[in-house]
UniProtKB/Swiss-Prot annotation:
This is Phosphoribosylformylglycinamidine synthase subunit PurL. It comes from the Archaea. Belongs to the FGAMS family. Pfam families: AIRS, AIRS_C, FGAR-AT_linker. Keywords: ATP-binding, Cytoplasm, Ligase, Magnesium, Metal-binding, Nucleotide-binding, Purine biosynthesis. InterPro entries: PRibForGlyAmidine_synth_PurL, PurL_linker, PurM-like_C_dom, PurM-like_C_sf, PurM-like_N, PurM-like_N_sf. One of its GO terms (biological process) is 'de novo' IMP biosynthetic process. Mg(2+) 1 binds at residues 116, 571. Mg(2+) 2 binds at residues 140, 301.
Amino acid sequence: MYRKVDVPFELYEVEILDASEEELAKISEEMGLALSVDEMKRIQDYFRQKGRNPYDIELQSLAQAWSEHCCYKSSKYYLRQYLLEASKADYVISAIEEDAGVVEFDDEYAYVTAFESHNHPSAIEPYGGAATGIGGILRDVLCMGAQPIALIDPLFFGNLDTPYEKLPRGTKHPLYLLKGVVAGIRDYGNRVGIPTVAGMVFFDNSYLTNCLVNVGCVGIVRKDRIIHSRAGGAGDLFVLAGGKTGRDGIHGVTFASAELDEKSEEEARGAVQLGNPIMKEPLIHACLEVVEKGLLTGMKDLGGGGLSCVIGEMALAAGFGAEVYLDKVPLKEEGMAPWEIWISESQERMMLTVRPEHIDEVLYIFQKWDVPATVVGKVIPEKITRIYYKGYKIYEMDTEFVTSGPEYCRPYVARKPEKELHEEVEPPADYVKTFMKMLSHPNAAFKEWIVRQYDHEVRASTVLKPLQGKMNFETHGDAAVIKPTRSFRGLAITADVNPWMCKVDPYWGAASSFDEMVRNLVAVNAVPHSFNDCLNFGNPEKPERMGEFVEAVKALGWMAKGVGVPCVSGNVSFYNETPYGAVAPTPSLLGVGIVEDVRKAITSEFKGRGAVILVGETHNEFGGSLYSAVMGQRCHKVPRTSPERLKTYSDAMLESFRKFEVKACHDVSMGGLAVCIAEMSFGRGLGFEAARELSFVELFSESNTRWVVEVPESVAEGYAEFFRAKELKAEVIGYSGGERLDFGAFSVELGEADKSWREGLTKFL
């Protein structure tokens, strides 16, 4: 089925014209294409029309372009139906269409956001997988002409107390993965000089055999310097800038488009890319300089699929084709076959399109920064991609055929609620013991061990940091705030999802995650402005898994349209599944808000001598809650929300910040009101005394659309009345100060609770 072509390098003709379905399946498996028989038959028909067999490089190119990772073949239909309408707003400059979303920041500047997954590589090699995830997301923002200003990293692992002897075969321990991933993010982000300001870490045994590493980036760009991921016109030159091309990252996207198993590490280690932050830093400077001087017509990063995807996509987006001279590509090693060069995903590479009259100046600037840059091709009028290698034509395909991957409307089964919504949840026999267990649970406990490894202050623009409060008393903040320009206008950044809620009910779990994202932005006095999603799910070929995805997407679209917060960019990561099961549905969200004046941003810790007010409504809703996890109770009613209620309360909260002096604000989320108040107390070592006995449901329910606000006692009643006048619920529930957490129903020493919370994660390290 493979015939070596008579050329002075490795090139094979693959005999598919008369191949049977069994032979097509065998070719796909042997070449690592990860294409179905139907997809191979479509390729077979194309080359029958051409009257020839394809070369190996052509089949490999199609495998990259048609992978789940690159063409979204299982998700496009449902994203278009339920979510893409939520990408529209007057202030959105570019959404969904390119590598990153571009949104108006002020009259002069726009901010750029991108959010991706690097799950499979991190499960195989946690340090390298996480590091190259950071490298890739930086390039997504850079290719829009933006200076990266902040990194975000939601991480998901199996339970840290998993006994080694109970690990499935071929699985790395969650503690090893956690340490490797955190080190990879730390070393890459710190060395390239971009602050890591937000994120989350979540532990659940659905991630035991398939951890998730999601990475996000925010950048800033002058509106007149925004550049797009497309060529300018025929005659433009393709310039490959950055790192050399090697055998690392080959079949990265096809590896990411299949389930993991116990053989994955042995078979797919070469699919993990190797990052180099020391090359990335000058590459960023050089790219921004040529953008500032107006020397480029287009720019795009080399991510999934490498050269095989970037050149065709840039050319076709402008209505043209490409001619490539593959032997001009700088290599890390000799002896690479043309197909390996074409699909390698080696890191730190950018593709630029440049008019011929500007090429010398562009190459000089990259030489000045000591970054390799080479002309590797040109844009041609025909919508065809041709590749030459050492004088031989080895590839010729219609660019539209390569980039028009399949699209499936996969069948799905929507999960039905397991029980009636009205369910009884047992209160704890011992309130204090239960509360201390909740505080020390790794999902609620202090994340200082992780946060302190990241430089969140480099670039000197981080106004609100991930940890807030008095030195040595810091607590978790709701969102970071960045001051990206000389004005006092700022960006608030948060990352949110609750996989436990999504596991119980994907629809209401996703809606609750959106609600929490908005709450976190509002809590720091930011107007919710846009969001990105990173949708992590199992095998889409299984109707139950596809049902989880569809329900989550429906919920996000409903919430986004109703609240008026557009989805500007995103990512879908399927096949997060092994023979031992799929990950919990995990629709990670990256939220961005506008802070009109960073000097008026609000932190989460109690300041003392204040009245504590609960804003919002509490219901008996324990599905996916920390309380139900700690107590081992199966609760099925995930907290409800609605875009109308969320919008009404959010607007009222922001108005109240303008009208009243507000000392502190924190959203009520994991652990409910009790854990929320405890976190606010820990930030300055100030206790809390309830004004009345708070009930079990009030303390531990995780109902949505709630905040705890600290105000001076003198304005407390006026503040609560402000909400009541709008027919919204607000109540003075207590006062800050003292050395105890006294909730009426129970009371604990603040120091004991603080110790339990701060040691909840570190006791496993």
